[in-house]
């Protein structure tokens, strides 16, 4: 099983819960085929964070490596939001771009 941490940087964008759900659905659709070929299944962990929490997540990523295979950071304050992140082996999917 592949575990993907999806961390949302919250901004002042409206209706963020709905946007978060929509983004996760896009990620599932975009990633599921590639992930299933390598790992068998995909489990997504969602979290919301501000800049300081995000910095902590990145700093502690190596210590928490066994907890997830990839980290995507999504900025909800951008009009054309994007999700970019490294997904470690054995997965072949290295970068995701998700647009509205």
Residue ranges and their predicted role:
Residues 18-21, 52, 91:
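Generic alpha-helical secondary structure signal
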Residues 8-12, 27, 47-49:
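Generic secondary-structure microfeatures
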Residues 61-100:
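Short, mixed-charge low-complexity intrinsically disordered segments
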Residues 14-34:
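Short amphipathic alpha-helical segments
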Residues 29-77:
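Short, intrinsically disordered low-complexity segments
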Residues 1-21:
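Short S/T/G/P-rich N-terminal loop/turn motif that feeds into the first structured element of a domain
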Residues 14-16, 53, 81-82:
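Residue-level signal for secondary-structure boundary sites
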